[in-house]
Amino acid sequence: MSSNVLDTLYSIILDRISNKKEGSYTVKLLEKGKPYIARKVGEEATEVIVASLSEGRERFISEVADLIYHLFVLMAVEGVKPEDVYEELKRRMK
């Protein structure tokens, strides 16, 4: 996955935060608050584990995408940019 795709996803999430697009799932998550979003990240992580063990490649990919999306929403709420995570990963590769 290109980091460009991830950056675009994060930009869309930030736009939803700023513009509160009606009917947006991201806006609905934000309205429920940080604790709810954090629980969704945990739920999606569990679904990734289950999919990896018993549901096949396609389902696994779908669940990973869900996890990344929800994690990015939580990151946006926390004020953490993808670049911050990229830098931490680079630091760990030394």
Curated annotation (Swiss-Prot):
Superkingdom of source: Archaea
EC identifiers of the protein: 3.6.1.31
GO cellular component annotations of the record: cytoplasm
Record keywords, A-Z: Amino-acid biosynthesis, ATP-binding, Cytoplasm, Histidine biosynthesis, Hydrolase, Nucleotide-binding
Alphabetized GO MF terms: ATP binding; phosphoribosyl-ATP diphosphatase activity
Name of one Pfam family that matches: PRA-PH
Major enzyme class: hydrolase
Listed Gene3D superfamilies: MazG-like
Biological pathway: Amino-acid biosynthesis; L-histidine biosynthesis; L-histidine from 5-phospho-alpha-D-ribose 1-diphosphate: step 2/9
Catalysis: reaction(s): 1-(5-phospho-beta-D-ribosyl)-ATP + H2O = 1-(5-phospho-beta-D-ribosyl)-5'-AMP + diphosphate + H(+)
Cited InterPro entries: HisE, PRib-ATP_PPHydrolase-like
GO biological process, one term: L-histidine biosynthetic process
Location of this chain's protein in the cell: Cytoplasm
Listed transmembrane segments: none
Similarity remark: Belongs to the PRA-PH family.
HAMAP family with a match to the protein in the record: HisE
NCBIfam families referenced in this protein's UniProt entry, alphabetically: histidine_hisI
UniProt-recorded name of the protein: Phosphoribosyl-ATP pyrophosphatase
Organism: Sulfurisphaera tokodaii (strain DSM 16993 / JCM 10545 / NBRC 100140 / 7)
Phylogenetic lineage: Archaea, Thermoproteota, Thermoprotei, Sulfolobales, Sulfolobaceae
